[in-house]
């Protein structure tokens, strides 16, 4: 196999869960896209990437059971995450931490406002979320947001130093900076439940939780690797971490990721079957619906041009990825996004 191409693992084969889409997708997606575009945050190129990425379609797959209002809220959140992610990818460690602080403070403190677009967008999302979210769910969501922003800053610092972590250090970082855990927290919001903190201390519950999270993170990394290497952003990717740590080539690494993703799914199914009924039906319901992230994310990755460009449907069939050349970077208007009115 040429080093200029590789074959993706067949993650659909290893994930027996059934995919579905949300009937409210078109309306919720259009409203959310208009909302975020109304702030004129993106350069022309970034706006095109935003539209092509179809973040709202991801929500339709992974939250297929959500009501109309709840789906709109999840679409707003993944679009907000796109803004934070795209801004921080263009920044050094200091800049990414400043962006993260704006995001976190606007999320946590209702009366805090630095006048920036990011703060305004974040506060508008939070007003929608807290209207229906329970108090424990809200607190966990904000705590996860703090961890997410810290890890996004750490990712930028690692990128600035051209430093690759070892696998043991990368996994906890990726669990947080991927925002998957924040997206899992939205499951409680959608279902209208507010799990006790003790549920998140249960061994089998957390084993299923982490297995689902890792499957989503590793799958996303193998699918996004070509796009990220073309942008010079592959340092925060399990593919680069494993090749560096294990001395394997790209194809060997892709094959290994496929094996591990299959194991994550098996671990999730096994742990879910062992969750004690004493945790209550809502705990099992939550874990059930978290699982749809594993299959929904896979389907979405092939359904849009975000990772594979115009050949995304062909690549779903052949699984052959031809590596793209490095891009000439064009920034997103990050200064406008985080600059306050007072400056």
Swiss-Prot record:
Site description Plays a critical role in the stabilization of intermediate cation, residues in chain: 82
UniProt free text on domains: The conserved DDXXD and NSE/DTE motifs are important for the catalytic activity, presumably through binding to Mg(2+).
EC nos: 4.2.3.-, 4.2.3.127, 4.2.3.128, 4.2.3.129
Enzyme class: lyase
Cell division listed as a keyword: no
Functional pH dependence: Optimum pH is 7.0.
Keywords recorded for this protein, A-Z: Lyase, Magnesium, Metal-binding
Single GO BP term: isoprenoid biosynthetic process
UniProt-listed Pfam families: Terpene_syn_C_2
Family named by the database record: Belongs to the terpene synthase family.
InterPro entries attached to this UniProt entry: Isoprenoid_synthase_dom_sf, Terpene_cyclase-like_2
Cofactor(s) it depends on: Mg(2+)
The keyword Nucleus is annotated on this UniProt entry: no
List of residues binding Mg(2+) 2: 85
Residues engaged in binding Mg(2+) 3: 220, 224, 228
Motif (DDXXD motif): 85-89
Protein name in UniProt: Cubebol synthase cubA
Residues annotated for (2E,6E)-farnesyl diphosphate binding in this entry: 306-307
Reactions listed under catalytic activity: (2E,6E)-farnesyl diphosphate + H2O = cubebol + diphosphate; (2E,6E)-farnesyl diphosphate = beta-copaene + diphosphate; (2E,6E)-farnesyl diphosphate = delta-cadinene + diphosphate; (2E,6E)-farnesyl diphosphate = germacrene D + diphosphate
Top-level division of the source organism's lineage: Eukaryota
Gene: cubA
Summary of the function given for this chain in its UniProt record: Terpene cyclase that catalyzes the cyclization of farnesyl diphosphate (FPP) to various sesquiterpenes, including cubebol as the major product and beta-copaene, delta-cadinene, germacrene D, germacrene D-4-ol, sativene, tau-muurolol, beta-cubebene and beta-elemene as minor compounds, along with minute amounts of further sesquiterpenoids.
Chain ranges for the short sequence motif NSE/DTE motif as given in the UniProt record: 220-228
Amino acids binding Mg(2+) 1: 85
Annotated thermal dependence: Optimum temperature is 29 degrees Celsius.
Molecular function, one GO term: metal ion binding
Annotated source species: Psilocybe cubensis (Psychedelic mushroom)
Alphabetized Gene3D superfamilies for the sequence: Farnesyl Diphosphate Synthase
